[in-house]
């Protein structure tokens, strides 16, 4: 895996009582792995099944946890991109947490010719809360910090 050290921030919402929340609060670290179009069923499974009720949910999904070199939290070996974060804040009332991204790891298979993560190779998914679908991202819609100049 190629890695990129970063200083960004990540925000996450995790409900109390979840095994993940307990682990994050205990270790003061977490990872956010990017689901892909090829891993929709596995990612959905680990999202809907509680680790408190199914301790082997990673194995049932065909996932393997591996230790991060940068934070005290696991990476999912089968997912090609992961944000590795240190916990900065956790609000018990809202269950909202903020972390500092200390590293971004990516599988060589999703790295483009320019040495950066290629979204077209990654094929990340996002959740559509209106229709309850997963949407694969990857079509270029425009040029950032450029297309808007036409309106000046």
Language-model-derived ranges and their functions:
Residues 2-13:
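Single conserved hydrophobic/aromatic residue that forms the stacking wall/gate
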């Amino acid at each position: 895996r190629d890695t990129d050290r970063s200083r960004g921030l990540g925000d996450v919402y995790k409900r109390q009582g979840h095994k993940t929340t307990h682990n994050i609060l205990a270790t003061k670290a977490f990872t956010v792995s990017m689901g892909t179009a090829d891993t929709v069923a596995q990612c959905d499974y680990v999202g809907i099944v509680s680790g408190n009720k199914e301790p082997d949910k990673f194995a049932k999904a065909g996932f393997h946890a591996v230790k991060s070199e940068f934070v005290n939290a696991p990476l999912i070996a089968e997912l090609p991109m992961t944000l590795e974060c240190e916990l900065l804040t956790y609000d018990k009332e809202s269950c909202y947490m903020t972390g500092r991204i200390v590293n971004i790891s990516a599988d060589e298979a999703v790295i483009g010719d320019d040495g950066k993560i290629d979204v077209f190779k990654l094929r990340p998914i996002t959740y559509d809360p209106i229709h309850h679908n997963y949407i694969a991202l990857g079509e270029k819609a425009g040029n950032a910090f450029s297309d808007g100049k036409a309106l000046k």
